[in-house]
Each structure stands twice: as structure tokens, then as C-alpha cells.
Amino acid sequence: FTICRMPVAANDFALDWYSYNENEGDFAMEKFSIAHDEQTLIPFIQAAQAYNPDLKIWASPWCPPSWMKYSKHYASRSTMKMARELKESLKEGESTYMSKVVDNGLPEDQEYHEGRDAFIQEEPYFKAYALYFSKFIDAYKAKGIDIFMVMPQNEFNSAQIFPSCCWTAKGLSRFIGQYLGPTMREKGVKLYFGTMERANTALVDTILNDAASGQYVEGVGFQWAGKDALPGIHQNYPQLKFYQTEQECGDGKNDWAGASHSWDLMKHYLKNGVNVYEYWNTSLDEGGVSRWGWSQNSLVVVAPDGKSFTYTPEYFIMKHVSHYVMPGARRIETEGSYEDLLAFINPDRSVVVIAGNNADEARTVTFRINGATYSPTLKAHSVNTFQIK
């Protein structure tokens, strides 16, 4: 792997909820500290850097310091209310995906939902939050970890029961254009808009068509339902870079069905112009249960004793692409009736074809590349990589 995403403070898999400054009113960020990350996150990244010193890292917050939100709480949605609504929506025989329900302490009347700014829309808070990003960049740089790009908010439309923060596009436009954008440019750090989890191109239009915020945005990140906005945004803004920022999380079974879904997602994103495709999570314990009760898939499953691990089918799906498609490669358009494939040309001019077969029986397909013909037989329920040098 050549690029990865990290959280700015807590996310939904964090051992506990925290920010880098929970001292309310410290607008000068005098008590800013990444000490919490020195326990696990920083050593984890440094270990990855030991394997790949050229690993590129970008970051986004799930939540600002809680005192910067109107609710003064990390979460945006009450766990107990969500669990009650899920239970009421179930049909007979159905079960919820939440394996456990833990009260997150957010009063129901303090929820902030899509279409409302949960972040306090006042200049001192905007300035302090931009400074928070700046100090994060500096603190990680001091640890030998360069953050090359940031996105302002993970899933900015989603009111979650874990650390989260809803923003309107207008609120983010103001923050980017007047505060975060100038601060990151001064640091030499790129700024992308995202992460986009809605199929609503107007959200991106609001940011990019504003003269103040649009000048700072060099790309857009998409995940979940945001993938359906990608084709139109790619067509309207071809000058930008596009990232797939989070793999859809699965159900913790880590089976072929999950891998097949990942392959379908890869094809959609890569055929519609993304430059980067990323996974979530890299490694989890068996079952992959998040702190709030969702069993999720991972590339690696760690045994309960912590002494061994297993690569999952989705690890090999990722490897089919990432091991053979080099940075700087370009996707090649293909013709014909067989569409379960991706093709790339690497900087060294080698051609890589990744071909899938989700049928219950083997299938022979024929490729014609540069005048040569290849007719491999693809096993049932498989993904296959061919490299032509």
C-alpha cells in the first residue's frame, strides 16, 4: 500500500472518545496535545513507515473538540433513541446489526441532524479550529509523520452515535474559505473537500462555486452513497483529484460475498475517475465489533490471543490491484461484452488486467492487447490479475 488515511483524534473505533484539546475556551490552543496518540496510533503509523518510508498519509476529523459544538458532546445522535427506532423498524424475524447497545449519554433534545451546523458558527471557534488543524500538522511532523492533505470532516451530513459533527455545505464553505484553507496553504498541506457520503452534487457545487472556498479545494473524497455523485462531479470538475475514502464496512463475516461487493465497488470508483481507493479497517479482532456494536470486515483478522492473524478475502481483492497497479498508472478503457474487469497501463508500460468471475462455474474469456490474444479460464467466484510486460 502506498497511501493511507488517519483520524484527527477519535473515530468510531477509538478505544475512548477524545480530542487534542478538551479545555473549553482555549482558543489559543495553548493546551493542545497529541499525547493520547502516542500510546497506539503514532507507533502504528511509524511501524508502517518502517515497511514503506514513502507511505503517504492524509487525515480528517470525525469530531472537533466537544466544546466547539453546540451540544458540547462528541456524538450527534442518541444511542438509545437510535436503538429504539431500529427495533421499531424491524420486520418479524429480522435482527438489528447492532450487537450491543451502550448509552452514549447524549440527550435526545441535543441531537443535531443533517442540514444543521453542529459546529458553533462563530469566528473565535472557526479560528481556533483552523489553529487546531495547524498544531496537529506540526505535532505529527515532529514525530516524523508528514500529513500531506486534510479533509475538513468525515461524513459531514451524518448524525452518528459516535464522534461526529454535522455541517451544512455553507458552513463548511465559510470555514474552508476564510480559515482552514489559508491555514493549510501556509503549511503547504493540500485540502480536499469531504468526506462525501451523499449522492448530492449540489453540496460540492456550493464549495467549489464559492470564490473563497473553491480556490483552496484540490480534490473531493467520496464514500458510501457519495459514490453515486462521483460520475457527475468528475464530469463537471475534471481538474480535481478524486479519492474513494472508506470501504463499505460489511458485517464481520469476512467472506466471499464481502470480497465480491468490494470488487464491485472498486470497479465503480475506478471507472469513474478516482485516483485513490482505500479500505476501512486494516485489522480487527475476530468479529470486528466496533465500540458501538457494529461487526465489520477488515483486511486482517487478529486471533484472540494476539499471536496470529489471518488475511481475509478482501485483503486479496485489494492486493490484486495495489500490488500490480503502480502509482502513476492510468486506467485503460476496454471494449466488448465482458465488463467484469479493470485494465491499467503502468509507468513502465506494462499492462495489468484484473478480471472477475462471480458465477458458480468457471468461465473462459478472451483478451486482445496490442495485437496479442490471451484466453484464460477464470475459476468460479474469483478475481484474477494478469500482467503483460
Where is each model-derived feature located?
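Carbohydrate-binding surface patches
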Residues: 323, 334-370, 377, 381
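N-terminal catalytic cores of secreted or lumenal carbohydrate-active enzymes
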Residues: 1-147, 178
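Conserved, mostly hydrophobic/aromatic
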Residues: 57, 150, 220, 269, ...
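Active-site neighborhood of glycoside hydrolase catalytic domains
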Residues: 127-253
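Folded extracytoplasmic luminal domains of secretory or organellar precursors
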Residues: 53, 148-151, 359-361
